[in-house]
């Protein structure tokens, strides 16, 4: 088989939106080369340091590589893919020194290239995300989430995902009922299940995302707790007594449904909203307040913000 590699040079803030666009166009795998990953401390709790090479990383920004079967349909779609990526700037997503290049690669190269950039990520002192092909020995009481990031719908390495998992770790109580809006890889649903949630509804509008979520949920043996549904946000979801709603999606999308979140939550229920670029945080905060939610706190990692709000006790 012939494969094409789409290489995009952009900013860290644009990683997840760009990766999601590429996957929606049919990418079979995505790798992310971020110089910040090389520069930050990579020592784990066993004193091991991952052997990463500086030459594998860009001088600045992020390089995202996506792999497509080189079909006639793909070749015809190349201009549309490039334009869709450029259009992300209309959502105030900074693309930086945007570059878009298409190369041919052999079958073996695309299948393994991205694996060297993805290693276990310790999110909290309790939760670690581990790629499915790596052997990892957890410590006592450590929660392990296994992911195959080939579909690139949230690998746990992005700040927005980490902010959500930390908030879930802080607020989720055993026996809680959770809705995960825009589930992507299913990582937040899996984290919720392993933190003790009784039942979780994971929704995503994208069919590819729901398939990726189902595969990862099965990998983590949490399918008896998590139900995956292809759905547009909370549309036609009639739950009204939910403990936690979590959404790791763009601010512009969060603004579409705060009233629906309020209706879904029970009194005292928590809404964890991430995927919010710093410049949009105030707008989202005001929309949540207008819907009747009370802001509990805001957490920030880099340029990304998570807002934790609550439905008041009536």
UniProtKB/Swiss-Prot annotation:
S-adenosyl-L-methionine binds at residues 161, 182, 204, 248. It is an enzyme of class 2 (transferase). SUPFAM superfamilies: S-adenosyl-L-methionine-dependent methyltransferases (SSF53335). GO terms for biological process: methylation. It is found in: Cytoplasm. It catalyses: L-lysyl-[protein] + 3 S-adenosyl-L-methionine = N(6),N(6),N(6)-trimethyl-L-lysyl-[protein] + 3 S-adenosyl-L-homocysteine + 3 H(+). GO terms for molecular function: protein-lysine N-methyltransferase activity. InterPro entries: Ribosomal_L11_MeTrfase_PrmA, Ribosomal_PrmA_MeTrfase, SAM-dependent_MTases_sf. Its EC number is 2.1.1.-. Pfam families: PrmA. It comes from the Bacteria. Keywords: Cytoplasm, Methyltransferase, S-adenosyl-L-methionine, Transferase. GO terms for cellular component: cytoplasm. Belongs to the methyltransferase superfamily. PrmA family. Methylates ribosomal protein L11. This is Ribosomal protein L11 methyltransferase. The lineage of its organism: Bacteria, Bacillati, Bacillota, Bacilli, Bacillales.
């Amino acid at each position: 088989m012939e494969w094409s590699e789409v290489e995009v040079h952009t900013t860290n803030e644009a990683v997840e939106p760009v990766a999601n666009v590429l996957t929606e166009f049919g990418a079979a795998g995505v790798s992310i080369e971020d110089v910040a990953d090389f520069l930050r401390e990579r020592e784990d709790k066993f004193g091991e340091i991952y052997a990463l090479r500086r030459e594998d990383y860009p001088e600045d920004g992020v390089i995202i590589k996506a792999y497509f079967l080189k079909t006639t349909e793909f070749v015809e779609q190349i201009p549309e893919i490039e334009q869709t990526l450029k259009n992300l700037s209309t959502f105030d997503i900074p693309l930086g020194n945007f570059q878009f290049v298409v190369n041919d690669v052999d079958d073996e190269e695309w299948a393994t290239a991205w694996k060297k950039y993805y290693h276990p990520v310790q999110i909290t002192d309790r939760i670690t995300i581990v790629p499915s092909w790596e052997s990892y020995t957890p410590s006592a009481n450590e929660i392990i989430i296994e992911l195959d990031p080939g579909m690139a719908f949230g690998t746990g390495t992005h700040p927005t995902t980490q902010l959500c998992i930390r908030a879930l770790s802080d607020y989720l109580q055993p026996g809680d009922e959770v809705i995960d809006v825009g589930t992507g890889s299913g990582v937040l649903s899996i984290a919720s299940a392993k933190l003790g949630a009784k039942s979780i509804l994971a929704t995503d509008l994208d069919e590819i995302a729901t398939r990726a979520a189902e595969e990862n949920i099965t990998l983590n043996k949490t399918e008896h707790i998590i139900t995956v549904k292809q759905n547009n946000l909370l549309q036609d979801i009639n739950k009204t007594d939910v403990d936690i709603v979590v959404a790791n999606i763009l601010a512009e999308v969060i603004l579409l449904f705060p009233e629906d979140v309020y209706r879904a939550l029970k009194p005292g229920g928590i809404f964890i909203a991430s995927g919010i670029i710093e410049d949009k945080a105030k707008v989202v905060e005001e929309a949540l307040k207008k819907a009747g939610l009370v802001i509990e706190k805001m957490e920030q990692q880099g340029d990304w913000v998570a807002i934790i709000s609550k439905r008041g006790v009536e």
